[in-house]
Amino acid sequence: MAYCPRCNTYTEHSVSIYHQGKRRELAEGQRRYNRKLKGYGSSPKPKQKRFAKVNKKISLVLTCSKCGYKLHKSLGRMKRVELV
């Protein structure tokens, strides 16, 4: 049970792990970045020598069973997440 702001009640929610979508090559920021990489010279951003973080931040997607409203909840940093 979780609170749904659209239904304004506590309803059953299905839980899934959020996965990032595919990057769009034609997005303005991506085209700008590709122009900067073109030609001679180095990358506009410094390359990281060693990893500062060893795990990713996990985000859950709660989907309301009544109206289908999706809610994101952050779980913080974890090495492994398993939904049962």
From Swiss-Prot:
GO biological process: translation
UniProt-recorded Gene Ontology molecular function terms: large ribosomal subunit rRNA binding; structural constituent of ribosome; zinc ion binding
Cofactor: how bound: Binds 1 zinc ion per subunit.
Disulfide topology: none
Names of required cofactors: Zn(2+)
Gene3D superfamilies assigned to the protein according to its UniProt record, in alphabetical order: 3.10.450.80
One cellular component term from this protein's GO annotations in UniProt: ribonucleoprotein complex
Highest taxon of the lineage: Archaea
Positions contributing to Zn(2+) binding: 4, 7, 64, 67
Keyword Ribosomal protein: yes
ZnF bounds (C4-type): 4-67
UniProt-listed Pfam families: Ribosomal_L44
Keywords of this entry: Metal-binding, Ribonucleoprotein, Ribosomal protein, RNA-binding, rRNA-binding, Zinc, Zinc-finger
NCBIfam families: PRK05767.1
Self-association and partners: Part of the 50S ribosomal subunit.
Function field: Binds to the 23S rRNA.
Record PANTHER family: 60S RIBOSOMAL PROTEIN L36A/L44
Family, as annotated: Belongs to the eukaryotic ribosomal protein eL42 family.
Protein name, per record: Large ribosomal subunit protein eL42
Organism, scientific name: Thermoproteus uzoniensis (strain 768-20)
Gene that produces this protein: rpl44e
